[in-house]
């Protein structure tokens, strides 16, 4: 059955593991990274840092995940049971700017690692390089060899490579052109180090699916090929799409190739993959009654969790504690003890019951919609009153202050 790992969201990327039997109905089953390393660094909210474009692979009875951290290097973890405990992260190659790593175990026993570079950290980008790994896959043992240069202007911002081998060809699936408006590029060569031919195999075309790229090729047990990729939708995150993939003259064609030029457009409706059986409709969890001893997998903290942020119970509620804000506090951009989940849809309603027990003046609790621009509804203790407020912050990453207005108040003794 297919497994899928991704860097979830902008901040705390614990490597969620999703499982499916048919590539359509997915269940969130685990997190491969209970704590993000280095721990001291990620105890604070770190936007745009940590796990970038992980790849999950199965080899010799074990599941592997490789990813690039643009500030620390390329990491690897592994397990025999993806729903169980994963190994501690191994730093395969230390350095700045290395991102989007994917391994390949070749028939001759050699192990290769392809990755890209983030210009914001390394000063170079739009290139793909391949290094050799040791047999255990735990250490890079050769210098990087550049196999593709997108700085000629035709395929700028090439990144996110996935490496495969089929019919004697090495294939590199890589997005180019930028996250929001790019396209899906495929390279092929008979030699791991090239030279590689290149071809654009999927573009937005006449659809409303912008930037259809950066994903992985999956084969079903019935011989079908499919491509899972994302579409960037701004504040709503990176929405996942599934497109059919066919092979023509040893080139993949992704989506609907209406004019038969070898380059497809993403489909909006299509028949489900044929996997030999039917699976029930499944969606990731959203609602939570907070009546179990484990926090629902849909929830993530804004940074590495500390025990004193809150406690689960069997009693139908989650007990949260207020944290102390630093003297330099401007807004919630770097505050770690926010408990959040991704938007379930573009439009939705959230309902909750909150009991507020304030021990000190200035304590607050409430509901927040968090992002570069954010807004929240807090209840704050202010002297002898509880105040319901609305707070809005624009461009929080630029350390802009919140704009707060009072909506209602009630005397403490009234309660």
Regions inferred by a protein language model and the residue ranges of each:
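Extracellular glycan-recognition regions
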Residues: 243, 250-252, 257-415
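Residue-level detector of Asp-centered blade-edge/turn motifs that repeat once per structural unit
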Residues: 58-61, 105-109, 165-168, 219-222
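Asp-box/WD-like beta-propeller blade repeats and closely related beta-sheet repeat scaffolds
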Residues: 68-107, 115-117
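Single conserved hydrophobic/aromatic residue that forms the stacking wall/gate
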Residues: 1-8, 12
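Structural motif
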Residues: 13-16, 73-76, 122-130, 180-187, ...
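Loop/turn-rich, solvent-exposed surfaces of beta-rich toroidal or solenoidal domains
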Residues: 154-196
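Conserved Ser/Thr-centered positions that define the repeating blades of beta-propeller domains
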Residues: 5, 20, 79-80, 133, ...
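Surface loop/turn signatures of beta-propeller and other carbohydrate-active proteins
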Residues: 24-57, 85-105, 132-162, 195-216, ...
């Amino acid at each position: 059955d297919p497994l899928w790992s991704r860097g979830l969201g902008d901040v705390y990327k614990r490597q969620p593991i999703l499982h499916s039997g048919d590539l359509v109905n997915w269940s969130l089953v685990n997190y491969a990274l209970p704590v993000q390393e280095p721990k001291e660094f990620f105890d604070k909210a770190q936007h745009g840092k940590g796990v970038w474009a992980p790849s999950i692979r199965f080899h010799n009875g074990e599941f592997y995940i490789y990813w690039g951290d643009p500030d620390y290097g390329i990491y690897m973890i592994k397990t025999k049971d993806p729903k169980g405990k994963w190994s501690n992260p191994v730093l395969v190659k230390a350095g700045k700017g290395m991102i989007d790593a994917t391994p390949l175990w070749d028939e001759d026993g050699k192990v290769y690692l392809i990755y890209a570079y983030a210009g914001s950290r390394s000063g170079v980008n739009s290139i793909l390089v391949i290094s050799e790994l040791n047999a255990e896959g735990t250490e890079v043992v050769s210098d990087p060899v550049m196999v593709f240069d997108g700085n000629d202007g035709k395929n700028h911002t090439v990144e996110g490579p996935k490496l495969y081998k089929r019919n004697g060809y090495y294939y590199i699936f890589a997005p180019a052109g930028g996250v929001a408006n790019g396209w899906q590029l495929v390279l092929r060569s008979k030699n791991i180090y090239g030279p590689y031919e290149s071809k654009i195999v999927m573009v937005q075309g006449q659809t409303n699916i912008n930037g259809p790229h950066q994903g992985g090729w999956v084969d079903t047990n019935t011989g079908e090929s499919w491509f899972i990729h994302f579409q960037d939708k701004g504040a709503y995150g990176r929405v996942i799409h599934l497109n059919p993939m066919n092979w023509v003259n040893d080139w993949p064609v992704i989506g609907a190739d209406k004019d038969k030029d070898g380059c497809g457009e993403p489909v909006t409706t299509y028949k489900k993959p044929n996997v030999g059986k039917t699976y029930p409709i499944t969606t990731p969890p959203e609602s939570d009654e907070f009546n179990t001893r484990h926090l629902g997998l849909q929830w993530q903290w804004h940074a590495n969790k500390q025990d004193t942020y809150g406690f689960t119970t069997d009693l139908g509620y989650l007990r949260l504690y207020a944290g102390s804000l630093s003297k330099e506090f401007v807004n919630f951009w770097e505050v770690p003890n926010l408990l959040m989940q991704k938007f379930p849809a573009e439009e939705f309603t959230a309902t909750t019951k909150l009991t507020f027990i304030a021990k000190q003046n200035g304590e607050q609790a409430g509901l927040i919609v968090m992002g570069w621009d954010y807004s929240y509804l807090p209840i704050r203790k202010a002297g002898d009153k509880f105040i319901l407020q609305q707070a809005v912050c624009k461009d929080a990453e630029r350390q802009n202050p919140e704009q707060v207005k009072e909506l209602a108040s009630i005397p403490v003794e009234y309660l």
